Amino acid sequence: MEEYLVPLDQYLAAGVHIGTQQKTKDMKKFIYRVRQDGLYVLDVRKTDERLRVAGKFLAKFDPESILAVSVRLYGQRPVKKFGEVTGAKAIPGRFLPGTMTNPQVKNFIEPDVLIVTDPRADHQALKEAVEIGIPIVALVDTENFLSYVDIAIPTNNKGRKALALIYWILAREVLYNRKEIESREDFKIPVEDFEMRIIRT
């Protein structure tokens, strides 16, 4: 078997495999087991596989035609950093209705592919992507549905460390598949740069 994109321990330490206590029929194929406390655990091998697939897929697009969004707080820095590193556009925070469908909207954009951090939280962006007929790459947890999702990356899509690691790997895969870096080891940006800072008051 091919090695993981990062050591298995790194995936587990970031909590990538930790799902929720709900599961949908759509996500059944990505679930490894259910814990005694009722929490569903995701199959990290499938996360790893899907990150490879998504990286190859996204590398085919012009960087500025990729849009990554996250309404979820812990996904906002990861999508912003993903944008900086890959040249993609990023909308961290609230997604204004009409951003992709109404040319009158101030920051109107016409992407060719959309990345959502959570199909449920990012439902407005998802809806507009469906309307304009562009492919959708989504980070999906055990309680998500896969309607309209073209490439699903099964992961904890709520955790701060999990989201940082997933977007870090995805950024590295995009650059690697574009041949902008010769090997994955050439990606020198620390994963911490993708992590949402917590400001204690």
From Swiss-Prot:
Membership in a protein family: Belongs to the universal ribosomal protein uS2 family.
Native organism: Thermococcus kodakarensis (strain ATCC BAA-918 / JCM 12380 / KOD1) (Pyrococcus kodakaraensis (strain KOD1))
GO cellular component: cytosolic small ribosomal subunit
Keyword flag Plastid: no
GO molecular function list: structural constituent of ribosome
High-level lineage: Archaea, Methanobacteriati, Methanobacteriota, Thermococci, Thermococcales
Disulfide bridges in this chain: none
Keyword Protein transport: no
Top-level lineage group: Archaea
Keyword list, A-Z: Ribonucleoprotein, Ribosomal protein
Protein name (Swiss-Prot/TrEMBL): Small ribosomal subunit protein uS2
SUBUNIT field: Part of the 50S ribosomal subunit.
Gene Ontology biological process terms in this record: ribosomal small subunit assembly; translation
Gene3D superfamilies referenced in this protein's UniProt entry, alphabetically: Glucose-6-phosphate isomerase like protein, domain 1
InterPro entries linked: Ribosomal_uS2 (IPR001865), Ribosomal_uS2_arc (IPR023454), Ribosomal_uS2_CS (IPR018130), Ribosomal_uS2_euk/arc (IPR005707), Ribosomal_uS2_flav_dom_sf (IPR023591)
PANTHER family (UniProt xref): 40S RIBOSOMAL PROTEIN SA (PTHR11489)
Matches recorded under HAMAP family: Ribosomal_uS2_A
